[in-house]
From Swiss-Prot:
Quaternary structure and partners: Heterotetramer of two alpha and two beta chains.
Localization: Cytoplasm
One Gene Ontology term, aspect cellular component: cytoplasm
Name of this chain's protein: Arginine biosynthesis bifunctional protein ArgJ
EC number: 2.3.1.35, 2.3.1.1
InterPro entries registered for this protein in UniProt: Arg_biosynth_ArgJ, ArgJ-like_dom_sf, ArgJ_beta_C
Site (Cleavage): A193, T194
Source organism of the structure: Rhodococcoides fascians
Gene that encodes the chain: argJ
NCBIfam families membership: ArgJ (TIGR00120), PRK05388.1 (NF003802)
The keyword Transmembrane helix is assigned to this record: no
Annotated disulfide bonds: none
GO terms, biological process: L-arginine biosynthetic process; ornithine biosynthetic process
Lineage, highest ranks first: Bacteria, Bacillati, Actinomycetota, Actinomycetes, Mycobacteriales
Amino acid sequence: MVQSVLSSTSHGSERADMSAASPQGFHCWTTHLGLADEGKDDFSMVISDRPCTSSVVFTKSLFAGPCVTLSKTSIEQTSPRGVLVLAKNANVATGAEGLRNASEIRASVARTVGIEPDALIMASTGVIGVQYPMDTIRAGLDGLGQGTPLDAHAVARAIMTTDTRAKVSERAVGTSTIVGIAKGVGMIEPDMATMLSFVFTDADVPQDTLNRIFRDVVDRTYNSVSIDTDTSTSDTAAVFANGSAGPVPDTEFEQALEEVCTDLVKMIASDGEGATKLIVTTVSGASSERQARVVGKSIINSPLVKTMIHGEDPNWGRVLMAIGKCSNEVDIEPDRIRVAFADIDVYPSSSLDQHDTVEVVREHLATVTVEINVDLGIGTDTWRVFGCDLTDEYIRINADYTT
């Protein structure tokens, strides 16, 4: 049986029990090293007290950072039991020095907590092309201290960069708990995973099963979100299962894991840089899931659609434009297509007159979650994607990012 322990609304206001139990056997560390402004933690780490099964996916960017390189090597050697994250510096495009620095940091932390470096994957997020301030980091790590039982909200806050709120979701599956955290509000259209997302569970899940389930869930969630079409150099998503609570049915575990990751994806999209609205687009009647995703991504990535939604302007013809751009999908026939905003039909016709249709659509666009539903009328496959509106604030944030 799957139960919701903690979830968040699309704009981050949390409901349910903020002190919900965390999975057994995980400890965390959070501290301020000096990468971020004073008063904000910029270092975080979560480690299982016992060996884990784990599954990790990484960015496909050609400019993947040294932390991705280190972590890929580690998972070839062992099954990691934890993750450390530095925020406000991506350590990307930093060459051999950047790789040496990342290795030194991971080795130093591993010595402090008494594990092998390969037992930790490492992630880093922030400005590209800047070396770590190693003297500052070394001084900060000297006072790392003892870990505490996992506090997902503290870790989620420590990995934030331009995020405006922490992103945490939890589910209970039988006697086990799944908790997930994520960060990322810009440079987001993953091609494998997400910005940064880490899931911890005390369920006992065999390695092969965990790999299969996690990759399927990643495809349906993180690979189905886009804020600005840009794929990060540091994307990493991972799940760690330490088995402390015993086994759970595969189907229930997969359902709960997908619910956690879907919560996180919605939080990411609704917290997109400058965003005021979450866009959920469902494409049905496609000849394949791939086709449905292509059409859905074309809609949520269209600047004209995104600005239309931000301005609450019921110019639904822009959705047709975005579908029409998918010219490689040769079996799409415009005469078969149906488009609706939530349950409000707009194409090819509405039961309302034109004026009433416009006003009802305008009312829907005024909500914080905008639903666009497209039926291609070809086949039986469906896909759902998540995005956000495009605002002046997005431009301001990214025009001034390093200044």
